[in-house]
Amino acid sequence: MSLDTTEKQQLINSHQTHATDTGSAEVQVAMLSERISKLSSHLQQNIHDYSSRQGLLKMIGRRKRLLGYVRGKSEQRYSDLISKLGIRG
């Protein structure tokens, strides 16, 4: 459940901190969140796809680590990010 180029560019534009930002933690969390939501909907249809479930758990763990990093840097950036993405934190 990968993202195509236009989806990635929209996510980057909406979460970047400056004009050339493509890899900040906020952008990475946004891309992971989108991939997680797509993979979750796939797994609702394909219940026995265990390898995709493992990938989903890895992505969730990575997003959790990145959110911890953002929270350690700035509590305000963290709260803005989770409210913008609509995830609980």
Swiss-Prot record:
It comes from the Bacteria. Residues 8-24 have a biased composition (Polar residues). Residues 1-24 are annotated as: Disordered. The keyword Transmembrane does not apply. GO terms for cellular component: cytosolic small ribosomal subunit. Keywords: Ribonucleoprotein, Ribosomal protein, RNA-binding, rRNA-binding. GO terms for biological process: translation. One of its GO terms (molecular function) is structural constituent of ribosome. The keyword Electron transport does not apply. Part of the 30S ribosomal subunit. Forms a bridge to the 50S subunit in the 70S ribosome, contacting the 23S rRNA. PANTHER family: RIBOSOMAL PROTEIN S15, BACTERIAL AND ORGANELLAR (PTHR23321), SMALL RIBOSOMAL SUBUNIT PROTEIN US15M (PTHR23321:SF26). Belongs to the universal ribosomal protein uS15 family. This is Small ribosomal subunit protein uS15. It comes from Synechococcus sp. (strain CC9311).
